[in-house]
Amino acid sequence: MRKIIVGSRKSKLALTQTNWFIDQLKALGLPYEFEVKEIVTKGDVILDVTLSKVGGKGLFVKEIEHALLTKEIDMAVHSMKDMPAVLPEGLMIGCTPKRVDPRDAFISKSGASFKELAEGAILGTSSLRRSAQLLAARPDLQVKWIRGNIDTRLRKLKEEDYDAIILATAGLQRMGWDDEVITEHLDETLCVPAVGQGALAIECREDDTDLLQLLAHINDAVTERTVAAERVFLHKLEGGCQVPIAGYATLTENDAIELTALVGSMDGSVLLKETVVGTDPEKVGLEAADRLIKQGAKELILAANKGQQ
């Protein structure tokens, strides 16, 4: 019986996601054993700086990918939104389980909705994507950076001078917080989700055919296609955490991919947005990027990157 070593970050959410995925594999009843190996990433260690200033994509995966390449582990369970657009040679996303709710969750101290928040209220987020879109809708709000896991951020909302914070609905749901704390789910038209938000990425070595066959049982074709379009868009624009960039794709009734893509200025004064429909994930992602580039997306990205230096 083969033992599969599964790499995971040490956070409660990461371990919950990893153990959930292992349970899906165990339920197949095939002759495999599983062991979790906890790995500390750079993003887990640097907590006093905003993600955009630390260096963006790959912060939560590089050490785990090193363990995959050196065969310390056989596969890893990541949040898809943490994944860089390009993976190291020899590694691949071997499985994308069914995506859960991709929306952002708005949590306010007083129970006021986003629209009802008092003028000049303080909004906590560590995401340039969220802050740009929400400032575009409410330029009167003040954005204050907030880092830490879900528990830490909820505690900071309670104890510090934040009036509201934004978290990913998916993480809250996976941790069992959902209805208990969420004031409202922000509609995708108000705040386009991050590329891959709500989805998991199961990363493994390309040459591990045995494991790839096992992972195929859990793969969700709809999630795979839609997330692929989002990631092609992200790659073409070379976007990471340093840039207000968003992309969210769904399947239409006739099986086409509909991708809404967005790039914004840091302060939300400019939001470029396009919706592209097509059947091929790569073509849809590239078309969305090309349309935004024609509108000036590259200049916005350049300005955002300069602003982080």
Curated annotation (Swiss-Prot):
Belongs to the HMBS family. The keyword Transcription does not apply. Signal peptide: none annotated. It holds the Pfam family Porphobil_deamC. One of its GO terms (cellular component) is cytoplasm. Monomer. It comes from Bacillus cereus (strain ZK / E33L). This is Porphobilinogen deaminase.
